[in-house]
């Protein structure tokens, strides 16, 4: 049951989901058939099952949504998942109803943008070994392979590529953008602005920290990496989104990232804070109402059109100039 107070609408139910989203392993994430990722009947775009070879020799599998009836190459976007293993929809194994990346892809492709989303390495249909063994740098290389794939498609305008990253994905997007001038816009959702040890301390204070585990290469990088040093070098337009009830990354990190980007000389930065939204961009009050009304998980975990519209409006503006 959801519990309400004056400051935060919390729920053990939502808590369990978020813990799984952020900390669970790849075990149990199925290789779903292409039909699972097919658009709804009548959608003005197609969904194609695609394979992407990485420089390390891993085969990643994903879905490319492409607008129908195009007469010229269209802009393309790649979606970047957070720090836990997920399929291409950003779903954990036990809660496939959470499909934020499907929602984003649908909204963008309905408006003329091609979108590539991929199962994390070692998860779903993708190869590459255990996801937990991959460092942030290696994950960035996976996304670079996706960028190369998009640029090689005749349907895609290789000069109009954008990135949308959530959580760790919001660390990866700037890492790529500062080294690839073909990336012309990035969206950072719930992105950290401090080293990982500070994030871990915050999570411990909110009671959301995962179980202690032995240090691995991913954790070593996460603890030492300073996102602000990279943010200062970003030159493309940036949209920063954050929920003010984020239990994983403090909401003030949004403005810290924006300040760092502007400090580096890039003034094309937009910040949107969503009152009542958590790290997964779930509106907690709306989730409370839906659960009380007996709505299914697919409805409870659906991201509000408010968030989706902010993303799609901004991306369309920046990529179709």
Where in this protein do the model-derived segments appear?
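N-terminal cap/lid segment of alpha/beta-hydrolase-fold proteins
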Residues: 33-72
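Short, surface-exposed "cap/lid" segments of acyl-processing enzymes
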Residues: 69-73, 77-107
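Alpha/beta-hydrolase active-site loop
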Residues: 100, 132-154
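Primarily recognizes the serine-hydrolase "nucleophile elbow" in alpha/beta-hydrolase
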Residues: 145-203
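Mobile cap/lid helix-loop segments that gate and shape the active-site cleft of serine hydrolases
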Residues: 184-185, 198-229
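Short beta-strand/loop motif that positions the catalytic acidic residue
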Residues: 234, 240-242, 246
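Short alpha-helix in the alpha/beta-hydrolase fold that links the catalytic acid
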Residues: 236, 250-260
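Catalytic active-site module of serine/aspartate enzymes centered on a nucleophile-bearing elbow/loop
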Residues: 287-321
């Amino acid at each position: 049951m959801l519990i309400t107070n004056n400051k935060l609408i919390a729920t053990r139910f939502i808590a369990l989901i978020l813990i799984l989203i952020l900390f669970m392993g790849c075990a149990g994430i199925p290789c779903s058939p292409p039909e699972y990722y097919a658009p709804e009947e009548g959608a003005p775009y197609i969904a194609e099952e695609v394979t992407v070879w990485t420089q390390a020799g891993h085969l990643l599998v994903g879905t490319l949504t492409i607008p129908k009836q195009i007469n010229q190459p269209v802009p393309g976007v790649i979606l970047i998942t957070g720090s836990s293993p997920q399929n291409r929809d950003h779903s954990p194994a036990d809660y496939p109803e959470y499909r934020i990346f499907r929602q984003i892809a649908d909204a963008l492709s309905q408006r003329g943008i091609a979108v590539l989303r991929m199962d994390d390495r070692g998860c779903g249909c993708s190869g590459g070994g255990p996801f937990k063994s991959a460092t942030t740098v290696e994950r960035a290389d996976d996304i670079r392979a996706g960028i190369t794939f998009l640029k090689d498609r005749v349907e895609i305008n290789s000069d109009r590529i954008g990135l949308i990253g959530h959580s760790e994905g919001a660390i990866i997007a700037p890492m790529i953008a500062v080294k690839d001038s073909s990336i012309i816009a990035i969206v950072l959702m719930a992105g950290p602005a401090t080293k990982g040890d500070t994030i871990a301390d915050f999570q411990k204070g909110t009671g959301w920290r995962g179980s202690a585990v032995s240090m691995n290469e991913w954790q070593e990088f996460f603890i030492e990496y300073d996102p602000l040093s990279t943010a200062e070098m970003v030159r493309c337009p940036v949209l920063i989104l954050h929920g003010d009830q984020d239990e994983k990354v403090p909401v003030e990190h949004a403005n810290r990232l924006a300040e760092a980007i502007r400090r580096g000389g890039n003034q094309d930065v937009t910040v949107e804070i969503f009152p009542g939204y958590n790290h997964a961009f779930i509106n907690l009050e709306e989730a409370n109402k839906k659960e009380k009304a007996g709505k299914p998980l697919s409805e409870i975990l659906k991201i509000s059109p408010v968030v989706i519209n902010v993303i799609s409006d901004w991306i369309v503006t920046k990529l179709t100039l």
